[in-house]
A protein has these predicted regions:
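Helix-turn-helix
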Residues: 22, 26, 30-64, 68
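Amphipathic C-terminal alpha-helical segment
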Residues: 147, 166-187, 203-214
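N-terminal intrinsically disordered/low-complexity leader segments
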Residues: 1-18, 212-241
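Short secondary-structure transition hinges
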Residues: 109-143, 185-190
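Hydrophobic alpha-helical connector segments
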Residues: 82-112, 135, 154-168
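Short hydrophobic clusters on alpha-helical segments that form packing/core surfaces
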Residues: 23-31, 73, 77, 103
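Amphipathic alpha-helical packing segments from all-alpha helical-bundle domains
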Residues: 82, 125-151, 162-166, 195-206
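Amphipathic alpha-helical linker/stalk segments
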Residues: 72-96, 118, 128, 132-139, ...
Length: 241
């Protein structure tokens, strides 16, 4: 009987329905302190102020708790990338640079989510809901890469959009993980992580022969204007004399 009393005492102050959120927040705090692999299920319970048995009401194990955090992270990540991409406005290169900067901003401002998403060691296909959230976020990068691939000059071999998406994702992830998370122990840079990533992307695109000027893509030409009724037609050199 005594352990039930202890459990009730430990959970005092938690109303029905918010224990799950308390556990998620506790896990985020622990990730910030110890990393995604540095805490146990019991640690999360202790941080939330509940008994070791309480988390099992909402999560099968620690991996399921981490998967739930990673899923939320990918949902926030998708929203941020979508806003940054803005359907490629005002031009593809500028919009893509915004996506890269959004990637770095997420890693810097949401380090616990970022760690759960990319450093927890969870198998990507073990949780269908998590996998779907991850794919939706990556779809933004792939859509942007498809627009970049379409910029290939005529007659030049066009790399597969998926390959370009993976290349540029690797660049963004590398800069974010190595330099962009505000960790004082990480190597100092003589430039901002955003400037480093922008230079990498431009060098990559120019190496492929892509134009990298920031001009809006031309719109399809419409029919020529109709001259006023009774007026002689004008050619490319003006009105004939």
């Amino acid at each position: 009987m005594s352990w039930r009393k202890d459990e009730r005492r430990a959970e005092r102050g938690y109303h029905h329905g918010n224990l799950k959120e308390a556990l998620l927040q506790a896990a985020l705090d622990l990730i910030a302190q110890k990393g995604a692999a540095g805490f146990t299920f019991a640690d999360a319970a202790r941080m939330a102020g509940v008994s070791p048995a309480a988390p099992y009401r909402h999560f099968r194990d620690r991996d399921e708790l981490l998967a739930s955090i990673a899923q939320r992270g990918f949902e926030q990540f998708e929203a941020l990338l979508t806003q940054a991409w803005d359907d490629g406005r005002p031009d593809t290169v500028t919009a893509f640079e915004r996506v890269g900067k959004a990637y770095l901003r997420f890693a810097r401002e949401e380090p616990s989510f970022y760690s759960a998403m990319f450093e927890s060691g969870l198998p990507a296909d073990a949780n269908p809901t998590l996998q779907a959230a991850s794919e939706r976020a990556f779809a933004i990068i792939r859509a942007a890469a498809e627009r970049l691939a379409a910029m290939a000059p005529p007659g030049m071999p066009r790399p597969p959009a998926m390959m370009m998406a993976l290349h540029i994702w690797s660049m963004a992830h590398g800069v974010a993980s190595l330099f962009g998370r505000g960790d004082a122990a990480r190597r100092k840079l003589p430039m901002s992580p955003e400037d480093l990533l922008e230079a990498e992307v431009l060098i990559y695109l120019r190496g492929l022969g892509f134009p990298t000027d920031r001009r809006p893509e031309p719109k399809p030409a419409g029919p020529p204007p109709v001259p006023p009724s009774g007026a002689p037609p004008s050619g490319p050199w003006g009105t004939p004399k």
